[in-house]
């Protein structure tokens, strides 16, 4: 009987220790996905988690990334063999594009935004001013060469209890709309 209690105590200690290790596990951009902060006009805006993952999260997603990346090639929609290979080119093109659309959209002075580029998708994350013409900005951003889709994960309330994206400050909290 004492052996069983000791074993149970040891198991509980190991479980608690492993939970702590995984909670504090370092996050990094394992896939080298472009992640750009493009504006800082709203200083209270929480920084998105972006592509930063633990190694465990990265490994769990690896097969899914391969399938998603290769599907456009298999379907004949991509000139490159993997959709993720477009991301570096798109990052350069999007920098030029946002500079071009600034006079028409005034996004710099009305937002704190980050762009995450993954497999020809642009995830727009961060905060926008209530009067900001977000639809026009997203429409213009979608005109960037090789972009398949622009996904809006922005908020007008930086202090909302639930944001449409994961934050660096609280990476385990699920976004308000986790449909993507």
Task: Describe the residue ranges of each PLM region.
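N-terminal targeting leaders
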Residues: 2-13, 20-180
């Amino acid at each position: 009987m004492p052996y069983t209690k000791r074993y149970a105590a040891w198991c509980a200690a190991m479980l608690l220790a492993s939970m702590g290790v995984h909670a504090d596990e370092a996050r990094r951009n394992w896939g080298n996905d472009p992640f750009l902060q493009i504006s800082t006009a709203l200083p209270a805006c929480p920084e998105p988690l972006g592509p930063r993952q633990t190694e465990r999260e990265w490994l769990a997603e690896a097969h899914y990334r391969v399938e998603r990346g290769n599907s456009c090639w298999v379907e004949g929609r991509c000139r490159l063999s993997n959709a993720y290979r477009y991301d570096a080119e798109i990052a350069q093109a999007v920098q030029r594009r946002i500079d071009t659309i600034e006079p028409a959209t005034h996004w710099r002075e009305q937002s704190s935004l980050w762009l995450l580029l993954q497999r020809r998708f642009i995830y727009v994350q961060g905060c926008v001013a209530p009067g900001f013409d977000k639809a026009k900005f997203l429409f213009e951003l979608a005109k960037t060469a090789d972009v398949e889709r622009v996904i809006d994960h922005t908020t007008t309330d930086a202090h909302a209890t639930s944001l449409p994206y994961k934050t660096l400050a609280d990476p385990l909290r699920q976004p308000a709309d986790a449909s993507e």
